[in-house]
């Protein structure tokens, strides 16, 4: 099994460490050639936290947006954390256009931003159990479509969800010692292969 990690910007190295800890090979995807070269070998894709506007621009500049979108729509399992969640959203409240736009949800950028600051909590995540959650100016999921399963909420806000082959979290599971959400994603990848 090999998981691709979008490595344009953001917390990609931390995800690679978690996958290594779980005995799963990972590859950093920095440009279209990397993605096309490894695409047929990939069991899944991680879109890490970072700055979503910058990542969206880099995806477009590197001509990676449409090929990644097509792969996700064709069933490639994807795990978007924080900015990665924003990249997957069909609608972003503060922007006119989405990026990949594959997951039926509306998100609000930086909802856990300046007004609330970064914070840590623990909460139940369906199919995983009670897990630590680190929020760093994270987004919230304002609403989801019928096909989206809500996996976790904090203070009545949706912070983790799944739609078919797409898993998202507002928080950064790669910044804790708890690997269960990554294991959940690996299990999704195994089911698809």
From Swiss-Prot:
It catalyses: aldehydo-D-ribose 5-phosphate + D-glyceraldehyde 3-phosphate + L-glutamine = pyridoxal 5'-phosphate + L-glutamate + phosphate + 3 H2O + H(+); L-glutamine + H2O = L-glutamate + NH4(+). Its EC number is 4.3.3.6, 3.5.1.2. Keywords: Glutamine amidotransferase, Hydrolase, Lyase, Pyridoxal phosphate. One of its GO terms (molecular function) is pyridoxal 5'-phosphate synthase (glutamine hydrolysing) activity. PROSITE patterns: PDXT_SNO_1, PDXT_SNO_2. L-glutamine binds at residues 50-52, 109, 136-137. One of its GO terms (biological process) is glutamine catabolic process. GO terms for cellular component: cytosol; glutaminase complex. It comes from the Bacteria. The active site is at residues 82, 172, 174. Belongs to the glutaminase PdxT/SNO family. Catalyzes the hydrolysis of glutamine to glutamate and ammonia as part of the biosynthesis of pyridoxal 5'-phosphate. The resulting ammonia molecule is channeled to the active site of PdxS. HAMAP family: PdxT. This is Pyridoxal 5'-phosphate synthase subunit PdxT. It comes from Streptococcus pneumoniae (strain Hungary19A-6).
């Amino acid at each position: 099994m090999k998981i691709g990690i979008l490595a344009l910007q953001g917390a990609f190295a931390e995800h690679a460490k978690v996958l290594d800890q779980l005995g799963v090979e990972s590859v950093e995807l920095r440009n279209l050639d990397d993605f096309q070269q490894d695409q047929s070998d990939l069991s899944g894709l991680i879109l890490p936290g970072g700055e979503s506007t910058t990542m969206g621009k880099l995806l477009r500049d590197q001509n990676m947006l449409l090929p990644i979108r097509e792969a996700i729509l064709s069933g490639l399992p994807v795990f978007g954390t924080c900015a990665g969640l924003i990249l997957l959203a069909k609608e972003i409240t503060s922007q006119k256009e989405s990026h990949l736009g594959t997951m039926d949800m509306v998100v609000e950028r930086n909802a856990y931003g300046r007004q609330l600051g970064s914070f840590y909590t623990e909460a139940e995540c369906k199919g995983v159990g009670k897990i630590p959650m680190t929020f760093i100016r994270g987004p919230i999921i304002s609403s989801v479509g019928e096909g989206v399963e809500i996996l976790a909420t904090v203070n009545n806000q949706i912070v983790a969800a799944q739609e078919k082959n797409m898993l998202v979290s507002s928080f950064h599971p790669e910044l804790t010692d708890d690997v269960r959400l990554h294991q959940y994603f690996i299990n999704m990848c195994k089911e698809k292969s």
